[in-house]
Design a protein with these regions (language model features):
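Catalytic-core "active-site belt" of small-molecule-metabolizing enzymes
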Residues: 1-119
Length: 119
């Protein structure tokens, strides 16, 4: 999809891409309510041509209540992906050093089945 942008508008590295992504809630007039991680397997990374997992914000307008009908009009992929969703009891703000597994697990309040409808 980035190939569709003029070269001068494409992010030049991952940091620039994340900076652009940080502006998405304001541009979309929505609010970020969580995070997702894409391309968590080597096969998934190879499929989309990336070298590692990709973080992304989850916007409130794209979250649906249990039992909701999700329209696929305009959706290019027309697939549903099963996911595992975690609700956190506390925020884990960004930090320079990686967090330990124990610290992250201690912050998890609950685990839920979820579905993603990627586009």
């Amino acid at each position: 999809m980035l190939d569709a942008l003029p070269a001068a508008l494409r992010p030049h590295d991952a940091a620039a891409g994340l900076a652009i992504q940080a502006e998405l809630p304001a541009v979309a007039d929505d609010r970020a309510i969580g995070w997702k991680i894409a391309a968590t397997s080597s096969a998934g990374q190879a499929h989309i041509g990336v070298g590692g997992p990709l973080p992304g914000r989850i916007l409130a307008g794209f979250v649906h209540a249990p039992g909701a009908t999700v329209p696929l009009a305009g959706n290019r992929m027309r697939v549903v992906e099963p996911e595992i969703a975690f609700r956190f009891a506390v925020d884990l703000p960004p930090q320079a050093a990686p967090r330990g597994v124990g610290e992250v697990l201690a912050a998890v309040a609950s685990v839920h089945p979820a579905f993603e409808v990627p586009d």
